[in-house]
Structure formats: structure tokens, C-alpha cells
Amino acid sequence: MLNKVQIAVVDDDKIFQLITNKTLHTIEQVGTVWQFYNGEEALIYLQEHAGEPDQLPDILLLDINMPVVDGWTFLKDYLGLHDQLRKDISIHMVSSSIDPKDIERAKSTPMVQEYIIKPITKDKILDVIRQKAEKA
């Protein structure tokens, strides 16, 4: 992969954000990392930069349970925004929920590539990056 992968992390857990951000910055293939603390912040950013592929993430790591706009609502709203985006964003749900209903719901949502149970490891992030590179 020649270009560095841009990643957005959408999660209200500040400790998860801190650890994930530090981990992402140890990976050579990772370029820009955006941090959003709820789905609304991420949706606003995506809307504002819909026509600017360089300002959009390649991969979006999305939590389920967040204030303001949760992961499920984000996905519903993202569906309406998707056609405006000038980049194909790979969405991976990352949650501490082991509820089979959440896992099944994520797996049955076409735009969700994968359901990852926290904590997310460096190896898992590298796997997500490889998956994205294979689709490019």
C-alpha cells in the first residue's frame, strides 16, 4: 500500500480513544487519525468534507453505545450520506458488547465490514488495514 491509511475512531470512551490513538500512531501504514466522541460529531465532519476524499477516512472504527448519536443511529444517518461521499469508507464496529443481538445486527448490516469486541489490538488493526488494502 503506497498511501497511508486514514482512520476515524468514533467512541465516547476517552481511555479507549487514547490507547487506540497511541496504537495507531505506532503503525507505519497509518496516516491521519481523527477522533470523534459521538456519532453526531463524525456525521457532521463527513458531511462537511463529503466532496474532499483526502479529508475522509479510509477506515472508520465505530462504537455502539455513545451519547448524542449512538452507533446504530450513525449507521442509519450514514446511509443517507453515503452517496455524497467521494470515498468508500470501510466501517468496523468496535464495542465492548458481547450481546449476540448486537453482533448479529452488525453482521446483518451490509455497510459494516466486521464486529470487533474491545479491546482492539495492534494485530487486529493491521488485519483491518490489510482487508481495506485488498479491496482497493
Outline where the language-model segments fall.
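Conserved acidic segment of CheY-like receiver
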Residues: 5-15, 20-24
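Helix N-cap/capping motif at the beta->alpha junctions
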Residues: 35-45, 71
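Short amphipathic alpha-helix used as the core "switch/output" element in two-component signaling
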Residues: 44, 72-85
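Two-component signal transduction core modules
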Residues: 60, 114-115
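Active-site residues of response regulator receiver
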Residues: 63
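Receiver (REC) domain active-site loop signature in two-component systems and cognate sites
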Residues: 66
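Alpha4 helix (beta4-alpha4-beta5 surface) of REC/receiver domains from two-component response regulators
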Residues: 73, 87-92, 98-114
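A Lys-centered signature of the CheY-like receiver
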Residues: 118
